[in-house]
Amino acid sequence: MASSSSLVPDRLRLPLCFLGVFVCYFYYGILQEKITRGKYGEGAKQETFTFALTLVFIQCVINAVFAKILIQFFDTARVDRTRSWLYAACSISYLGAMVSSNSALQFVNYPTQVLGKSCKPIPVMLLGVTLLKKKYPLAKYLCVLLIVAGVALFMYKPKKVVGIEEHTVGYGELLLLLSLTLDGLTGVSQDHMRAHYQTGSNHMMLNINLWSTLLLGMGILFTGELWEFLSFAERYPAIIYNILLFGLTSALGQSFIFMTVVYFGPLTCSIITTTRKFFTILASVILFANPISPMQWVGTVLVFLGLGLDAKFGKGAKKTSH
């Protein structure tokens, strides 16, 4: 049968990818904050969700099952020749970025996490230039600098005498920095796959998530987090519904993410995932009353001004070697 992505006309593929990513991850972000920052129980016995590894494990299982279904029905003719070690390396950086990003939500609110992750095009670009010898036009670099300035304004916080709060904010930002670095390494791996093996989007999604499931499965068994999570879910069974919805929105969103990576490259994908985040921030502010200062709003405007200029003037990269 024909590949699922080949059923989409070329001129509609990029708008479809953007719309799919926007809709799926809009709801994904709301569910993520509801799960990780919600309070469970009543009175003095209230608990919080602290099982970041297990949450990503469930997410990867659902992603892998969804990708397998797509291959079974739409992509049976494609033969995947990508090396297993490349999938393994990509999954390590991929799940490392996801776990550190999810863990950061325990120390920073969702808008801060989202704006921090908006820097994703920077490591993807820099590592593409240094490791894959890509070249980008000057306008692209200027747009990225504008994004950096906006994010810096957003992340800046005047000193306060609050003790523990200062420590937790710093730790959350460190986790976001780690997540960004790993995002860049993931982008390099994916670019290598599409250039050398013409890896299909569904096969990429399936194998990266299978490796991630294996690694995370060992992690949650070794740390004992799985049993703690099961006990938590037994006390608060309502969370299971939200986690399953979270996994489903992740799987749908990832199918569009990998389609974008395969057809347009990791940098375009990172820019798409960033542009949709402004609306996610607005939803978080409205639904969860997360405060945003005037300086942070200026930073937000700069970030998305840079992205808008990039869409207009920043053309694709040229490869000098691969």
From Swiss-Prot:
Any GO BP: UDP-galactose transmembrane transport
Gene: SLC35B1
Principal location class: endoplasmic reticulum
Lineage: superkingdom: Eukaryota
Protein name: Solute carrier family 35 member B1
Species, as recorded: Homo sapiens (Human)
Annotated motif Di-lysine motif, positions: 318-322
Gene Ontology molecular function, alphabetical: ATP:ADP antiporter activity; UDP-galactose transmembrane transporter activity; UDP-glucose transmembrane transporter activity
PANTHER family listed in its UniProt record: SOLUTE CARRIER FAMILY 35 MEMBER B (PTHR10778), SOLUTE CARRIER FAMILY 35 MEMBER B1 (PTHR10778:SF10)
Functional summary from the UniProt entry: ATP:ADP antiporter that catalyzes the exchange of ATP and ADP across the endoplasmic reticulum (ER) membrane. Imports ATP from the cytosol to the ER lumen and exports ADP in the opposite direction. Regulates ER energy metabolism and protein biogenesis. Appears to be part of a calcium-dependent ER to cytosol low energy response axis, where calcium efflux from ER to the cytosol triggers ATP import into the ER lumen to maintain sufficient ATP supply. Provides ATP to ER chaperone HSPA5 that drives protein folding and trafficking in the ER.
GO CC annotations, alphabetized: endoplasmic reticulum; endoplasmic reticulum membrane; Golgi membrane; intracellular membrane-bounded organelle; nucleoplasm
Alphabetical keyword list: Antiport, Endoplasmic reticulum, Membrane, Phosphoprotein, Transmembrane, Transmembrane helix, Transport
Entry membrane topology: Multi-pass membrane protein
Annotated family: Belongs to the nucleotide-sugar transporter family. SLC35B subfamily.
Mutagenesis / variant outcome for changing residue 120 to A: Loss of ATP:ADP antiporter activity
InterPro entries: SCL35B1-4/HUT1 (IPR013657)
Domain notes: The di-lysine motif confers endoplasmic reticulum localization for type I membrane proteins.
Transmembrane spans: 12-32, 51-71, 85-105, 136-156, 168-188, 210-230, 243-263, 285-305
Compartments where found: Endoplasmic reticulum membrane
